[in-house]
Amino acid sequence: MHYYVLTRLELSTVPSRPSVSPPPGKDSLIVPGSSQALTIPPNIEKHFQNLEFRFHAGYWKVFTAKSVLGDKDASIFVFDKAKSNIKAPPRIGRMNKFALADLIKYETNQLSSLNHPKILYSMHGLEESKDIMAFASEIVHFSLPMLIHDEGIERLEVKLGVLQLIDGLSYLHNSAKILHGNLTPDAVYVTVSRQWKIAGFSFSVAAKEPNCYPCFPWTKKLPPSLQPDLDFLAPEYLQPNQVTVTSAADVFSLGVLICWIYSGGKRLIDAKNNLETYQIIVGQLTEALNCISEQLGPNLRDSLCKVLSADIDQRPSVQLMALIKHFDDPALSAMRQLDDIAQVFDPSQKAHFLSHTLHAALPSIPENLWFTRILPRFNEQLSDSVELYTSLSKPLFFMLEHCESHNIHKLQDWMRRILDNIQQKTLRAFVLENLSVLFRRLTDEKVEDKCMELIVHSIKSDDTSTQSSAIRGLSHIADFLPLAFITRKLFPSILSLPPYLHDNVPRQLDLLAALAALSDRCDPNSLQQLLTGVSLCSSHHPVIIHAKSRIVQRIVTRDPVRLRDSQLVCVHLLNPLVIGLANRDLRLVFEKIQINKLRKNMIFLELLIIPHPFFFSHAIFQKRMGELQWPIFRKGF
């Protein structure tokens, strides 16, 4: 049976559509490299504006656009009938010819009837003028050949894209009951958010019976452009008297496409539209797979041997392909779950995924995917989900801490968003404990101001856990805080802590650790404020005495000239050290070491009381320093 007769039968199954032939539109599209301006159909012009050429994809010229209603991003696919409408040879006794335009009508009609996340979404059906055919879809950024050849792609993203194709084919076979029939690189588009979408339904057919689809053989009598791509066609299409195929035909095409992707755009079968060459190559596919085994890896290669088998029964179903060992990867699983997070309606499941699963997988995900896939998903799906900000903060702060410096600015909006919604107790605690990441990595005055405001409010809070989080975080950010903020806002807020500190040794230790870090930033005036804060830790517990001793040591070894006020030295430093020497609860193991340190500190503080500059040349000072082998001018203590 001749191919063109079967094609007519196929087209007869397409629902009838009214002929659309409006007058030419007013606007013209200029395609780079072409001197001809394309006039878009009026109905496309009516609904879409700001068209700009993006790329060529097969016989389509693809433009970006904005919808008039809603200002949504879109892509306009334009076909130039005047130049590209290839026609079949005339039929005997008939003047009409089967042409590429007929396939396009069928393709867009099929596309409009399908609705699935992995199928290209049609926003506006086909419109036709005298010379132009056009339709609108969701925005696409690349064709698959552009992505593979020009942009480059991580292996993890390749796996993710292939799984998306598997999902799309599974929908076609099991739900829509459609065989794609021509799954080639030109049939796959990549959206701005890096989702791979299936299109190119010119040769798709509906099932006659369960898993039984009409088969139209490839023939030399028709131009290749009016037939499926021979290099991606299953061998059963070419069997003599073959009238039906199964979904295994699409599985074979998918296998060839996977080889094309993993080999960097090299065709596994390159028959150049020659049937004899095709048959020879198909008989040697095992050897062909061996040539690209390094790119495929052992697990995928072994699976593809079955996928590309000439024996239909050896090929797995498309959904089973997703279960092969090659795709058993925690990072890949996390990326897939993130892509589908909009379909999860339980907030607790989303929170667990973001704070645990995704956070744990981030070290295994290449950094460029953090910003090309993960962050865009956050922006699209989660920017308004304030209740999930605590869970989102974990992966976001991990990305901020570990990303390259040129990517830091991409996280700025999220950090501002988090600090603007800091009311949640758990979120506030997490941010307080990770303030050092913000100060160290992000140069943003607005964020820094918000952080300092958060610190003061948290210290003054009535919630003890919030106060603890704020105080514990101070020791990590002391070097980043402006001295004016420390003296005017931070120290006064610390003086409000006696109820929080009362008879609580761990809390007093946390405060002393914070004050020790802040002491390096203090001048003589602010040092008095700091030592007043030290006095708030009034416990006589040995660890408190030891912590105070370390603060004294830190101050006098860093810059003793700051200690000019003798009353300050006696009240805030000598007094607690004397108490420490008299403390009988000090463990015997540490007693000698502790007392020796306290002795040294006290002697030095006594000498500081002698008016400056006399004490530096005073004989007693020099003698006592020698006796104690004071290490102030040596490294260490």
Locate the predicted segments by residue.
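ATP-binding glycine-rich loop module of kinase domains
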Residues: 56-104
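Conserved end of the kinase activation segment
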Residues: 236-248
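Conserved short submotifs of the Hanks-type protein kinase catalytic core
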Residues: 130-143
